[in-house]
């Protein structure tokens, strides 16, 4: 699917400036309070058949690290955990975005040299003259042209669902979050840290657009 958008929209989505940033829209709900006990967490894959994936194991460790920063501990198994956290993640094949933008053309707007010539008439007859005058040139925008940029925009989605555990039995859900991020990086592993950081920026009540700076190899 091809879309025509302005360059301003592209920059608004993928970020610009000396350090790239990941923009993530976060929506979260919770029954946790500042007085809620922390306890230990164990992260599982959603769907479960991803649990053997090396990619999932990497994200599992990163997500557990985020909980550690919030005062939780890492459980070695679901049977010994106080909470189980279901992690879902996905990235699409990308959408082609064609952007158009205006490029100014710079040139001389005034000044420089000018040639003059003419004829002078008097009582004794006439005489021709010619000469050149000079003034300091000034420069500015004298026109514009249109440029085109083509990018592939990827949609990345992360869902986190946290449940109480009682002797290994799953109980009530206490936290849920959905994070949607769009950008030109098509590798989930390159942006997952920034997405997790965005979700936990005001844990457990992060909502709205969150921007996290990062370094990427996409």
Question: Residues of each region from the PLM?
Answer:
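Residues embedded in well-ordered secondary-structure elements
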Residues: 5, 74, 149-151
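Short, low-complexity, polar/charged sequence segments that are solvent-exposed and flexible
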Residues: 60-65, 103-108, 179-181, 194-199
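C-terminal/domain-edge helix-coil "capping" segments
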Residues: 16-33, 141, 145-218
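Sec-dependent bacterial lipoprotein signal peptides
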Residues: 1-16
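Surface-exposed short loop/turn segments
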Residues: 88-166
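Soluble periplasmic/extracytoplasmic beta-strand elements of cell-envelope proteins
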Residues: 41-44, 84-88, 159-161, 174-178
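Noncatalytic linker/hinge segments flanking ATPase motor cores
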Residues: 82-89, 131, 136, 198-206, ...
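A structural "domain/chain start" motif
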Residues: 16-70, 75, 80-83, 90-99, ...
């Amino acid at each position: 699917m091809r879309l025509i958008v302005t360059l301003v929209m592209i920059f608004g989505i993928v970020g610009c400036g000396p350090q790239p940033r990941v923009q993530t829209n976060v929506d979260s709900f919770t029954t946790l309070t500042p007085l809620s006990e922390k306890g230990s967490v164990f992260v599982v894959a959603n769907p479960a058949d991803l649990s053997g994936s090396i990619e999932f194991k990497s994200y599992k460790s990163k997500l557990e690290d985020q909980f550690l920063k919030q005062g939780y501990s890492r459980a070695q198994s679901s049977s010994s955990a106080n909470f189980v956290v279901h992690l879902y993640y996905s990235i699409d094949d990308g959408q082609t975005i064609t952007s158009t933008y205006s490029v100014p053309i710079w040139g001389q707007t005034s000044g420089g040299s000018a040639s003059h010539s003419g004829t002078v008439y008097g009582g004794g007859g006439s005489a021709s003259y010619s000469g050149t005058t000079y003034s300091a040139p000034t420069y500015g925008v004298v026109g514009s042209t249109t440029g085109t940029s083509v990018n592939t925009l990827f949609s990345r989605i992360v869902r986190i669902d946290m449940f109480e555990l009682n002797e290994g039995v799953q109980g009530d859900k206490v936290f849920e979050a959905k994070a949607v991020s769009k950008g030109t990086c098509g590798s989930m592993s390159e942006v997952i840290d920034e997405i997790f950081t965005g979700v936990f920026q005001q844990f457990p009540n992060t909502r709205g657009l969150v921007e996290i700076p990062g370094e990427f190899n996409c």
